[in-house]
Amino acid sequence: MIAIIDYGLGNISNVTRAIQHLGYDVILTCDDKDVQKAEAIVLPGVGHFQDAMHSIEEKSIKDMLKNIHDKPIIGICLGMQLLFQHSAEGDVSGLELVPGNIVPIQSSHPIPHLGWNELKSTHPLLQSDVYFVHSYQAEMSEYVVAYADYGTKIPGVIQYRNYIGIQFHPEKSGTYGLEILNQALKGGFIND
């Protein structure tokens, strides 16, 4: 079973359908007991970082996620950004699970970064075109396992311990997106 954290901001229905299409049972929850029983946890998200953190803190999700070390926690789009320490969007702290910060995209290309872009990575699964919609990005770091070139390097997938971030929308990225999501649910793209 996959637990999708329902904190009130997210692309829950599309992500739920994608995970079910991969053959998993899904539960929408904020309950610690459900999360403890899950094989993996997904934190989806669309919207403003500050609003998301306010909702997460109201529902005591931050402490719950900080205590999980034995299964993948996957953040998608805004959910990936929430995994980090701080965001310039609203100047607010994140979940502080992954070192680094979220900053505005600095590119000569139009913002938001909207549409299909090719991932670049040494991992064979992470070399495909995927669908992005965002104006903020994680800073480049040693935790980036795939990036897109948008006049600047945009982290597309990060992994730090059991935390996996996917900046693009795998549920909207066709067959490759589903394969990437499935690999994340199984534990990710690097071996510790």
From Swiss-Prot:
Organism expressing this protein natively: Staphylococcus epidermidis (strain ATCC 35984 / DSM 28319 / BCRC 17069 / CCUG 31568 / BM 3577 / RP62A)
Cell compartments where the protein resides: Cytoplasm
SUPFAM superfamilies: Class I glutamine amidotransferase-like (SSF52317)
Main location: cytoplasm
Pathway participation: Amino-acid biosynthesis; L-histidine biosynthesis; L-histidine from 5-phospho-alpha-D-ribose 1-diphosphate: step 5/9
Entry-linked NCBIfam families: IMP_synth_hisH
Described purpose of this protein according to its UniProt entry: IGPS catalyzes the conversion of PRFAR and glutamine to IGP, AICAR and glutamate. The HisH subunit catalyzes the hydrolysis of glutamine to glutamate and ammonia as part of the synthesis of IGP and AICAR. The resulting ammonia molecule is channeled to the active site of HisF.
Molecular function terms, GO-annotated: glutaminase activity; imidazoleglycerol-phosphate synthase activity; lyase activity
Matching Pfam families: GATase
Domain Glutamine amidotransferase type-1 residues, every copy: 1-192
Gene Ontology CC: cytoplasm
Catalysed transformations (reactions): 5-[(5-phospho-1-deoxy-D-ribulos-1-ylimino)methylamino]-1-(5-phospho-beta-D-ribosyl)imidazole-4-carboxamide + L-glutamine = D-erythro-1-(imidazol-4-yl)glycerol 3-phosphate + 5-amino-1-(5-phospho-beta-D-ribosyl)imidazole-4-carboxamide + L-glutamate + H(+); L-glutamine + H2O = L-glutamate + NH4(+)
GO BP: any one term: L-histidine biosynthetic process
The protein's name in its UniProt record: Imidazole glycerol phosphate synthase subunit HisH
The protein's assembly and partners: Heterodimer of HisH and HisF.
